[in-house]
Amino acid sequence: MSSQISRSVGRWEKGASNLQPDVEIVQRLLETAAHALQAPELDPKGVDGKIAQVSAKSNTVAAIEAFQSRSNISIDGLIEPDSQTWQALMQAAGGT
């Protein structure tokens, strides 16, 4: 699995690109972090490479926001390459 995203993932209304390969990477990392931290609220409920257009219905956006809250990061529902959220997620999932 690649350990980097090329564009932003998360809330469409925040301008996220949500490219399928990037979304899949984030979803897999969230799954891994949910298991490692024993935090089911971080589980995006599947890896399909998609973000619901209505963020309130997106399990992935909910998982991103739960991760940001747990990590004391500003909650915006967005993960950008090399952002604080990305770095924390990589660490939580055991990535580099």
Listing of model-derived features with the role each one plays in the protein:
Residues 1-96:
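Cell-envelope/ECM-targeting effectors and their regulatory/trafficking segments
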